[in-house]
Amino acid sequence: MTWVSLFYVSSQDFEGDIKSLKTVFSQFEKQIHQKDGYRFSPEAEFAMGWYFYTIYVKIGFIKKLVEYNHIRDPKVKDEKAILKIVQNYLKIQKSKSRIKFDRDKPTLRGYYHWLLR
């Protein structure tokens, strides 16, 4: 499977935020029974007190995750809902980090049409 850059993270507490992100992505792996579905960029950039790094996922991993969450909540149609889950988890952990899509448009933008057939 191909790795794609999905999320871009800006963090002031590198160690704490990496731990929180690993926790939430490990839970995602347990939900869909898949291993090695995500990885972090090998090197983080540091500037002005912030660390910047990318989270890469396998296309199959994110598709299964969207399908799983769509079954639980039909409003989930693409990875935007996954981004919200991650952002909410970081808020609960009182993290100041920012997470967003690594590009302008989500990877699975039109994928939900297949789910609704």
Model-identified regions with their sequence ranges:
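A common structural junction motif
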Residues: 29-33, 71-81, 90-96
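Short, intrinsically disordered low-complexity segments
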Residues: 33-74
